[in-house]
Amino acid sequence: MKKLLRLFFPLSLRVRFLLATAAVVLVLSLAYGMVALIGYSVSFDKTTFRLLRGESNLFYTLAKWENNKLHVELPENIDKQSPTMTLIYDENGQLLWAQRDVPWLMKMIQPDWLKSNGFHEIEADVNDTSLLLSGDHSIQQQLQEVREDDDDAEMTHSVAVNVYPATSRMPKLTIVVVDTIPVELKSSYMVWSWFIYVLSANLLLVIPLLWVAAWWSLRPIEALAKEVRELEEHNRELLNPATTRELTSLVRNLNRLLKSERERYDKYRTTLTDLTHSLKTPLAVLQSTLRSLRSEKMSVSDAEPVMLEQISRISQQIGYYLHRASMRGGTLLSRELHPVAPLLDNLTSALNKVYQRKGVNISLDISPEISFVGEQNDFVEVMGNVLDNACKYCLEFVEISARQTDEHLYIVVEDDGPGIPLSKREVIFDRGQRVDTLRPGQGVGLAVAREITEQYEGKIVAGESMLGGARMEVIFGRQHSAPKDE
């Protein structure tokens, strides 16, 4: 069934265009041709009638009525074998005079025709027509050719009837003039054959021109299809916007879709990378706890709450990053209020377990009144990455302090490590960029932290600590709390 549909409804736009246009051209050509032929035929009949009427007037002029009889005196220069034949009837339809004696033709004249002026046609077989034109050898040859092609062919003869009223010298007469040469043998009849030839030539010329027109008109679509194939083969990123006006909107919308899909893909990939990085700390805590259980430094009852807490943290992180992946640009941030001190206590407790062997000393100087306005997981993600870096690169001490204004929350993390060179203090926030390539890491944590703070119209500033190491100042904006309902 599908093959039949494809056969009758081609999928190619060029073939569709060619067939539709060819059909329109054919219909219009037939319509115009038929109108022209019908007009020509009507004009030809009128011309023939006028010529035959002229013959009728001539014979009426030559006719004389004497002793109740009609006499027609033909001059010597009028050939009795002329291409017309004249019959004259009285008002009762009785034949008064005949130019030639052709019985079969006289029988074909209908009595009703004789009552008024008119133009008529009679059908005769080839043999009868041949008898009517026995003296014309060229016509006889043409009739022979017709007879050889079709012995039963019929010839059409034109008949003009003219009624003349009675006068003082002439009674009422009806003159019938028959064109002895059939219409089929006249050169004017060839116009139908010419029409077929012209129509055929028209189609033979028009179809190639239509094909060229279709090829030229559909080139932009072919170019677009080629660009789509290049997109599929990853040889181009976007469609060329410089196209025809009709395709501009389509190309623009497709490019928007491509950009949106690419951004969404990049977002998912980035989110997956960030999730992997964020799970490092809870997994490290679990690993450290299991190591302590194995060495019997910690009992099962002590390890259980720690492990459950980290498992809960992993579950929260997965949910958090799935939520981030589904968020669209411009999504409103949460306006929840969270005390900063408890959040940092939980983070430092987890990091102490991770860096237990290193013996990191983390000190907090956080006022209980200081709060964070926003998504709790955002705060934990930012501070977790910053504190993890501080614990990783410090020698022993890490200090955390905080202050708050009406619009901003400032948290400062300092360590006594080697610090960050001045030339690297902006590079470290780029994904995949790390100052110390000897230590394990992917260079993702600080990039994630900065992206989140920028969502809060904040930033992270790297500097030099009074302890001799790095100083990271995390600034959260948009910290004005939501107005309370009165």
UniProtKB/Swiss-Prot annotation:
Its EC number is 2.7.13.3, 3.1.3.-. A divalent metal cation binds at D151, D152. The keyword Nuclease does not apply. Changing D152F: Wild-type effect concerning mgrB transcription. The modification Phosphohistidine is found at H277. Mg(2+) binds at N385, Q442. It is a multi-pass membrane protein. Residues 274-480 form the Histidine kinase domain. NCBIfam families: PRK10815.1. This is Sensor protein PhoQ.
